[in-house]
Each structure stands twice: as C-alpha cells, then as structure tokens.
C-alpha cells in the first residue's frame, strides 16, 4: 500500500489514517482548520478543489455520511488520496478526480454541488523563494491554477445558494475578495 518515502499519519479525532509523503507535499494546519471549521449539512453534495492527498474529504467524511468528491491535478497526490480512502474503507463515499480545474466545465454539469471547499495554492507564480521540488511548487504556487481558476470552478459547480469555503493567507485577502466579486460568489 505504501510507496517510497510514504508514511501513514493518524487523524486522531476522526479515527482515520492518511498517507503522506514529504517529498510530494504534506497537509498542514490550514487544511486541518478548513476541514474542522466546515459544516457539512445533511443533504450537502460536496466537492473539494485542490484536494492534495485527500485530507479535506477525509475530515469532512468524519462529519457526514454524504458522498464527497475531490479534484487534484498531481497524479501522485491523487494516488495517495485514493489509497487513503481505501485504507479507511471509504471508497464507497469518497472519490478523487485527477484533473485540471480548468476542465470542470467539460466534466461536470453546472450547479451540481451545495458545498465546495478549496485549499488553493497561496503564492503567486512569480514570487521569489519557490520550493525546489516541483510537486511542492505546484501545491504552493499558482503554477497549474490560480485564485481566479479556483473561484470560477467553484462558481460553475455550485448550486444557487450553495456555499464556497476556502482557506487563504491574510496578505491575499484583497485578491480573494476581488476574485470573489468578479466571480459573483
């Protein structure tokens, strides 16, 4: 089940296990906060964007019996998420799609979800001090998707009156608010 440099960490509160790999990218406090502070309602249909190794779907699965989906572009992270779902016997409820956020328009009908969560890359692509590892760059910097892409994907996926819950850095608050306004969310 584990590949090179992988380990199993425990989500103690939820009673779940998750496969992580520091060579690719491991979740941090911001992902935990997003998962812990997001309310999943009884009839929610849930999609997690920029899903990484699937930590948000796992955290949300502990709060609900609803099916939860995620979208992630990096193949290795998708594999880790899928294996974590299997490890926790959640394959019947959790699904991870390997795809570019820009492809949601061709893959998903509009207005199908009541809750969309997102832990996007925080740093602009041209920011100095990018990580040396490509997987870390993609997870942390707006290389494969930017804030606008995340918000537009959420808008496409959300039903009228649906909720979009995102975590981001305080210094990007004005960017977030501007894109939310442009995206009409």
Kindly give the residue locations of the regions a language model identified.
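Class I SAM-dependent transferase core
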Residues: 2-41
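Glycine-rich, phosphate-binding/catalytic loops in enzymes
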Residues: 35, 132-135, 183
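Conserved Class I SAM-dependent methyltransferase catalytic core
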Residues: 144-185
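Short secondary-structure boundary/capping elements
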Residues: 26-30, 52, 142-149
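Conserved SAM/SAH cofactor-binding pocket of Class I
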Residues: 36-118, 123-129
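Short beta->alpha junction loops/turns
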Residues: 23-24, 74, 169-170
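Short loop/edge segments at beta-strand edges and connector loops
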Residues: 20, 98-99, 168
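Mobile active-site "lid"/loop adjacent to the S-adenosyl-L-methionine
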Residues: 120-149
């Amino acid at each position: 089940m584990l590949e090179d440099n992988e380990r199993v960490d425990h989500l103690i509160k939820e009673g779940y296990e998750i496969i992580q790999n520091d060579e690719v990218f491991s979740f941090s406090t911001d992902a935990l906060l997003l998962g812990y502070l997001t309310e999943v309602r009884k009839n929610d249909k849930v999609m997690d964007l920029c899903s990484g190794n699937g930590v948000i779907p796992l955290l949300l699965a502990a709060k609900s019996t609803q099916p939860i989906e995620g979208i992630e572009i990096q193949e290795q992270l998708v594999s880790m998420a899928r294996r974590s779902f299997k490890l926790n016997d959640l394959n019947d409820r959790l699904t991870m799609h390997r795809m570019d956020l820009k492809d949601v328009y061709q893959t998903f009908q509009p207005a199908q979800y009541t809750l969309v969560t997102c832990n996007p890359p925080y740093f602009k692509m041209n920011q100095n001090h990018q990580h040396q590892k490509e997987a870390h760059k993609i997870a942390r910097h707006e290389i494969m998707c930017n804030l606008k892409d995340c918000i537009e994907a959420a808008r496409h996926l959300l039903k009228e009156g649906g909720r979009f819950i995102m975590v981001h850095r305080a210094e990007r608050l004005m960017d977030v608010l501007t894109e939310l306004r442009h995206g009409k969310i």
